[in-house]
Curated annotation (Swiss-Prot):
Keyword flag Protein biosynthesis: yes
Keywords: Cytoplasm, Elongation factor, Protein biosynthesis
Membership in a protein family: Belongs to the EF-Ts family.
PROSITE patterns xref list: EF_TS_1, EF_TS_2
Name used for this protein in its record: Elongation factor Ts
A Pfam entry, by short name: EF_TS
InterPro entries recorded: EF-Ts_dimer_sf, Transl_elong_EFTs/EF1B, Transl_elong_EFTs/EF1B_dimer, Transl_elong_Ts_CS, UBA-like_sf
Chain's role: Associates with the EF-Tu.GDP complex and induces the exchange of GDP to GTP. It remains bound to the aminoacyl-tRNA.EF-Tu.GTP complex up to the GTP hydrolysis stage on the ribosome.
Presence of keyword Cytoplasm: yes
Record organism: Nitrosomonas europaea (strain ATCC 19718 / CIP 103999 / KCTC 2705 / NBRC 14298)
Length: 294
C-alpha cells in the first residue's frame, strides 16, 4: 500500500475541486496513483477534465516580441522565486531582451542561449548570474519559442503572467489581436479536433462511457450520450470549436470563415504553468477544517 501524503491529497483537490476526504479515499483505492484517482473521482462526480497544466505555483514573467512587419517573433518565460523579484525592472528587462534575441536568432531551445551575447561584452548566462547575485533569488529561463512566418504574427500579453503568440493568414491586425486575446481568456489546447492527442481523447471517452453506464440506460442510448459528450469536450479544448469571447453566438471557426482567415498555430504561456512548489500552509488548512468539524 502506497503512503498517501497530505501533499498528494492537496494536489488531487486542486485537480478536481473535490473535498479532502473524497480525494484521500480515491488515492487509497488507487494505491497512490494520481491519474487513476482523478479518473475515479471524475467517474463518480461527473466532473470535467482537470486543467492540471493550469496550476500556477511559480513566479516570474512572460515576455514577447514581434518584429514590425509581423513576420518574426518569440515568447519566453523566465522564473524567479517571489512576485517581488518578478516586478523588478532589471528582471523584466532581462526577459524582454531574451525574447528579442530569440526572435532575431530564430531559437526555441533556451539551452542554446547561454553563450549568446545579450549585452555589450556579456552573455545571457553572465547576465542571469549577475541578476541572481543582485536580487538574491534563483532565476531560470524556463521555456521559449520563436516564430518565422510568411503570413502574420499577433501577440497578446496579459500583464506579464499570460502570453500568446498566434500565426494566422487573412483578416487584419485587429483580427489577430482578437484571436490572441481570445486564446488568453479561453485557453484552448490546440487549433482543431484532429490535433487533440489520441491518448487524451481515449481517456475522456473511457471516463464518459463509465459515467454514462451508471445511468442504467440501453447501450445505444449510452453510445449517443458518449458521442455527445466527446463533441462537447472537443469544442471546449479546440480553438475552432470555442465560442468567440467577444461574440459567444459564433464560434472561432465561423469567425475565421467570415474573415477568410486561417490559424496555422499558436502558443499560450502562463507563468508557472504545471510547476509546483512547496506549500507551507497545507497543515494549517487541514487543522482549520478539523476545528470547524468539531
Amino acid at each position: 500500500m502506497a503512503e498517501i501524503t497530505a501533499s498528494m491529497v492537496k494536489e488531487l483537490r486542486e485537480l478536481t475541486g473535490l473535498g479532502m476526504m473524497e480525494c484521500k479515499k480515491a488515492l487509497v483505492e488507487a494505491d497512490g496513483d494520481m491519474k487513476a484517482a482523478e479518473d475515479l473521482l471524475r467517474i463518480r462526480s461527473g466532473a470535467k477534465a482537470s486543467k492540471a497544466a493550469g496550476r500556477i505555483a511559480a513566479e516570474g514573467v512572460i515576455s514577447g516580441f514581434v518584429t514590425a512587419d509581423g513576420k518574426q517573433g518569440a515568447l519566453v518565460e523566465v522564473n524567479c522565486e517571489t512576485d517581488f523579484v518578478a516586478k523588478n525592472e532589471d528582471f523584466i528587462n532581462f526577459a524582454g531582451n531574451l525574447a528579442r534575441l530569440m526572435a532575431d536568432k530564430n531559437i526555441s531551445d533556451t539551452a542554446l542561449l547561454e553563450d549568446m551575447s545579450i549585452a555589450e561584452g556579456e552573455t545571457v548566462e553572465s547576465v542571469r548570474k549577475a541578476l541572481v547575485m543582485k536580487l538574491g533569488e534563483n532565476i531560470s529561463i524556463r521555456r521559449g519559442i520563436s516564430y518565422q512566418t510568411k503570413d502574420h504574427l499577433a501577440m497578446y500579453l496579459h500583464g506579464s503572467r499570460i502570453g500568446v503568440m498566434i500565426d494566422y493568414a487573412g483578416g487584419d491586425e485587429a483580427l489577430g489581436k482578437d484571436l490572441a486575446m481570445h486564446i488568453a481568456a479561453s485557453k484552448p489546447v490546440c487549433v482543431s479536433s484532429d490535433q487533440v492527442p489520441a491518448d487524451a481523447l481515449e481517456r475522456e471517452r473511457q471516463i464518459f462511457t463509465a459515467q454514462a453506464a451508471e445511468s442504467g440506460k440501453p447501450a445505444n442510448i449510452i453510445e449517443k450520450m458518449v458521442e455527445g459528450r466527446i463533441a462537447k469536450y472537443l469544442a471546449e479544448v479546440t480553438l475552432l470549436g470555442q465560442p468567440f469571447v467577444k461574440d459567444p453566438d459564433q464560434t472561432i471557426e465561423k469567425l475565421l470563415k467570415t474573415k477568410s482567415a486561417k490559424v496555422s498555430g499558436f502558443t499560450l504561456y502562463i507563468v508557472g504553468e504545471g510547476i509546483e512548489k512547496k506549500s507551507d500552509d497545507f497543515a494549517a488548512e487541514v487543522m482549520a477544517q478539523v476545528t470547524q468539524s468539531k
